[in-house]
Amino acid sequence: QTHPTSAQALAGFERENSLGIDRTAFNRVYRDKTSKPELLCALSDFEMLCGFAPVTESLARAEQNGWLELARHLKLTGIEKTVRWALEEKVHKTPSNLPQHLRKVAELYPNSGGLLVALLMNYVVLKPGDAVYLDPGNVHSYLGGVAVEVMSSSDNVMRAAFTQKHID
C-alpha cells in the first residue's frame, strides 16, 4: 500500500467526487483531500517491506535466485514498468526460492503479482523502540510484529496486493 501526496489526494478526491463515488463506497480511494504521512514505532520485532531496493540489487537478487521472468522484465523495462506488469497480470506462478519473510505471504496469496513486487522491495526488521517515517508515496507492507502507527487524519490508501480491501 501507499498513501497519496497532498497534490495527489486533492486531485483524486475531486476526481472521485466528480464521478459521483460516495465517500463511504468500497471502491473509494480518496476519501478526503489530505496526504497521509505516518510514523511507525515497533513494540516488538517488526518485519516490513519499505520502498524499492536499487534496481541493480533487485536484478542481482532475481538472477541469483532464478527468477528469470522478473529479471528479464526489470532489465528491459525498469522498476516502474516491471511493477505495473506484475500487478496487471492476473496470475503469476509463485516464484521458487522465496525468502523466508515472504513464504507466509505466498501461502495466503499464491500466484499473486504482489509477490513479484515484494521481491523488489527493501526488507526491514525493526527492534522494539525502533521507528520508521513513511513519506506519502512510499510503498510499504507490514509482514509481522506489533507496532504503533502515528499518522495524519486521512483515510486515503492506495492498495496493490495482499488485501481483501479494494485494490486500486
Where is each model-derived feature located?
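Active-site region of the double-stranded beta-helix
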Residues: Q1-D130, H140-D168
